[in-house]
Amino acid sequence: SALPLYSSEYTPAASAVLADVLVPALAGQGDLDPHRVAAVLSPFKGHRQAKAALETAILDADLRTRDVPLSYHLGAVKDRVACGVSVGITPTIPALLDAVEGYLADGYVRIKLKIEHGWDLEPVRAVRERFGDILLQVDANAAYGRADIEHLAKLDAFDLSLLEQPLAADDLVGHAALARRIGTPICLDESILSAEHAAQAIELGACRIVNIKPGRVGGYLESRRIHDLCRAHGVPVWCGGMLETGIGRAANLALAALPGFTLPGDTSASERYYATDLTPPFRLEDGHMTVPTGPGIGVAPDPDLLE
């Protein structure tokens, strides 16, 4: 985004902080171990997405020189991962049903619906009634408050696999209260910025599932830390999406192949977002995508498209 509407980070600022602060901070480090990047950049507050981009580039370069796939380095146990899709808020319920029908026809194994005040119970009911026993979850993007707990409890009627980030990112106590009231598992997204945040949320009972977005948490190494912590506590995780090109999609597939990623993620096919991707397109096959096996992230951008 060109404006900080989703989070405090946005594209022009990320580009600027990389050029002016983060890259120069690493320039004098010599041959840098990718596992030291986060520590070197830690004095600079925030900017996790920019830090993730830089760490991933260094990790990719290091793994390529050693002919090691990212999936192997992270500890992947699968050669393909199940794929879900996120469906935004549509003008009408018929339009929503048409969109869901199309994605199911494409082969996606899980449907996620965005919800907000005035667009929650009825669209969820319509999808459940129309499509029956599909794997269905909802994402509120922090649209609700503690005053809405009783309203959100009505979602229990629809046998959802999870309710994602219903309350504000910093309201772990509110999420814990909601989790005690409803049967639908609470999944945290924006609340989790590190393994430490995940540990606090689990200790408070604020969630039963965690969505891991590498950009949000500062990179794939921190993502693995969160995965390992959640797995140790019996908390399932899944890989969220942030409109990645094929570069980020390849790395996300490597991450999603770890053993604790037991729920389908938002790893949609390239064609959903790009007429022409920066890499060879990722395609859905039988509801799954293949994890790249080449060194590093396993793909390379088309140089002509980078001009």
Residue ranges of predicted features:
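N-terminal amphipathic alpha-helix/helix-capping segment at the start of soluble metabolic enzymes
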Residues: 38-42, 64, 68-80, 282-284, ...
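Glycine-rich phosphate/pyrophosphate-binding beta-alpha loops
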Residues: 1-9, 84-89, 241
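Predominant activation on well-ordered alpha-helical scaffold segments within soluble catalytic domains
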Residues: 19-23, 55, 59-60, 125-128, ...
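Extended hydrophobic packing segments that form well-structured cores
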Residues: 297-307
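Metal- or metallocofactor-binding catalytic centers and their adjacent structured scaffolds
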Residues: 1-65
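Shared catalytic-loop signature of beta/alpha-barrel
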Residues: 170-187, 192-288, 292
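Conserved, mostly hydrophobic/aromatic
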Residues: 22, 54, 67, 111, ...
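Metal-dependent enolase-superfamily TIM-barrel catalytic cores that perform enediolate-based chemistry
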Residues: 71-182
